[in-house]
Amino acid sequence: MLDINEILERFKKNRFVLKALQNPRSPSSVLNYMCSGDTNDPLVKKSLNNINIVSPLLVIWFQSGQSLDKLCKPFIPTVRELKSKPKTLIGNEWDSIDGKIAKVLLADQLSRSCFRGTSEAFAYDEIARDLVHELFNEKNRNETLKKPAAILYLLPWALAHSENIKDLESALSIIELTVKVYPEFTLFEGRNKQAVYQHQQVLEKFGRYPQRNNALGRTSTVQEKKWLDDKANLPIWAGGKLPIDQDIK
């Protein structure tokens, strides 16, 4: 089994990742970068339903920390285009299901890496949430659910990152849909759902995500400061050590 550093080094040298960085203003480039392969290739699409193939990608998505922040910088102009008025990320490519998914990944995943530690890391969250709701509305749901499991795994995170607990309830509903389509892809019932539950617990406790306070210029309460200092009870995704399958105290 490869260790984290080996996975990261292979990702940085992957030809589809490098090609995506040369043409970042393209939905296929966003998808290829996130999936570390040619997502237009039927064999690659099929492989993205295999948990053994997808598991190393979890390192890229959730354990890479700052190590890939510099690599993804070419996506910054495209991320910022999400807020352009009038809208510029439009047309057949961007308005397709794949295009909408790519915009979610730009707004929710890549923005956090491109702008880590600043308020801009969260500036595109509303765009990502609205797009996920659109992807799973009555009109688009069936088409969206045809996408590979790895892609579907990433979409609920845009809702889990919301500080509106109703969005997290929607995230759980989406996960239930994906479980029915891919019952053998255990990351949905496992890590995906567990992460949403943990995010819910934080919102129920504080009404917001305290680990964002510094970046957003918010003043932490005494209770929030105490929690942020308690690394053993602070989730990994908030900078602590608490595993994703354990409850917040």
Where are the language model's segments positioned?
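Intrinsically disordered, low-complexity activation-like regions
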Residues: 1-102, 106-249
